Amino acid sequence: MAHKKGVGSSRNGRDSNPKYLGVKLFGGQAIEAGNIIIRQRGTQFHAGDGVGLGRDHTLFALVDGTVAFSIKGPKKRRTVNVIPA
């Protein structure tokens, strides 16, 4: 028999940091060039006119203007545009 009590160890107790994904500016809001519109994993929203796509699929404004969302094409893709001011 063991002379010491076996101490169990839990394999839980880890959690990843929050990623703060989602829409940062909504339709009709004013935006400046370089501002982030959406942080996302994959292309849930696609870049339209005046919008750039970052390495991590972040959508950002290329020009100053107003944010506009639309659904285009047969695949019903959600696109984000920036209408120049």
Curated annotation (Swiss-Prot):
Keyword set includes Secreted: no
Keyword annotations: Ribonucleoprotein, Ribosomal protein
Ribosomal protein keyword on record: yes
InterPro entries linked to this entry: Ribosomal_bL27 (IPR001684), Ribosomal_bL27_CS (IPR018261)
Gene3D superfamilies attached to this UniProt entry: 2.40.50.100
Record GO biological process: translation
Example GO molecular function: structural constituent of ribosome
Assigned protein family: Belongs to the bacterial ribosomal protein bL27 family.
Name of protein: Large ribosomal subunit protein bL27
Gene it is expressed from: rpmA
